[in-house]
Amino acid sequence: MRNLIRSVEFDEFYSSLPLNVQNKVQYAMNIISEIRVVNTKLVKKLVDTDFYELRISVGNEYRVILFTIDHENFIEAQEILLLNGFIKKSTKDYKKEIEKAKQILNTLSDENKD
């Protein structure tokens, strides 16, 4: 079973979602925490990054940027950090959201050094 760690930014995104979308996100989180090998329709590696995306479709395309803490490979990882989420409108959204995820990760890393 995986341990999912939620960032403040993820929690802010999650709480802003309509209840039906929150339910779907929670369902997806349950799947990735309990099932080791997850279909790429749900979790996919983001090209040229250290991140993965959790893919949720409820009318709109919702994405959550994930980071595997203890292993580079999602399947092997036991600690997953949920960094931030967004509504995907175009592929251009990814660059901005990946930069935001990097900033969150750097901030969390700096906090853990103290």
Give a label for each model feature.
Residues 83:
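Conserved catalytic cores of phosphodiester-cleaving nucleases, focusing on short active-site segments
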Residues 1-62, 72-79, 87-114:
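Basic, Lys/Arg-enriched alpha-helical interface segments
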